[in-house]
Amino acid sequence: MTRPEWFACVGELELAETVTWYGMATAGRWGHGGLLSGPSKAPVYAGFYWSQVGDEPAVARVSMVVLPLADPARIVAADWNDGYNGYEPAALDGYAVLCGDPFDPLHVGGRDAEADLREVKRIIAAGDGQGRRVNYAEIVTDPDRGGNALFFPVNEEERDGYEALEEDGTVVCLAFIAYDFPY
């Protein structure tokens, strides 16, 4: 994983059922259930770094995303584990997708997920062209329930996630990374 050079709050994620870092995947999805009851949204913090290829201008890429679901004291006291119990290849080359499972563009009836992806690519390409430090795209997939999906530009091919769990199994924080599998 490339170490983030800065973090920024990028907004909120609508919580429902499970949260996944593998949005837009038709198979091989991992999800995090057991979320705190009560909050319907969680703040999302993304760790960015500058990435440069050759003589091209540097662009902001994401290597880590954190969703704190409780106060810091509860998160510090929790046990952390590998929430996915292994790795999976990314569903989308060049992007990581964070969403509540029912708000994944592929799972919302009547949505054109490919049109959503084209819009995401347009937004992120525009941000690259502007040298935007906090470059990501949010797509509202279910306006009636406020459901959304957050798309992050990544260079790495793999995705993984970690959970901070209380003794009763309640998830109080999620952390997600993008990385390259060492061969």
Where are these regions (language model features)?
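Intrinsically disordered, low-complexity acidic regions enriched in Pro/Ser/Thr
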Residues: M1-Y183
